[in-house]
Amino acid sequence: MDFAEVEIIKFFKCLNTNHVKYLLVGGFAVNIHGFNRSTSDLDIWLDDSVENRTPFVNALLEYGIEGAELFHTLPFIAGYTEISLNNGFCVDVMADLQFFKQREFNECYTIAKEFNITNDVTVRVLHINTLIKEKEQSLRPKDKIDAEQLKKLYKK
């Protein structure tokens, strides 16, 4: 799965149109930063504030997610709070990462980088140094490999 996938582009367009504060994390973020590996889902870290919940729900409604209203109160837990796009691709929604927690979201959001995935759609991606630190804290071997490969690419 890649960013050329129409449903992924449509999903990010809905997030951006509704001014949702999110960061792309996980395998797609690793790919954007230059280490290409396969990934089975799209991981997004959301600002879990009252002010961000309504735009997020509006984005889901615009995209066509049934039951989107539940996201007004549903906890954003990695591996638990998932959305299935129209193509069956899974979006994993989280309020906390392994290392970085919600209280650090705004700081991470401020230093994040925007990348164009099409001429008119951008995604906000966890900064490379933040992503490496996050991946280093994981217990999963593939995340450790991601961190090492990203360090090599950026000669950190």
Please annotate each region the language model reported.
Residues M1-K156:
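Compositionally biased terminal segments of proteins
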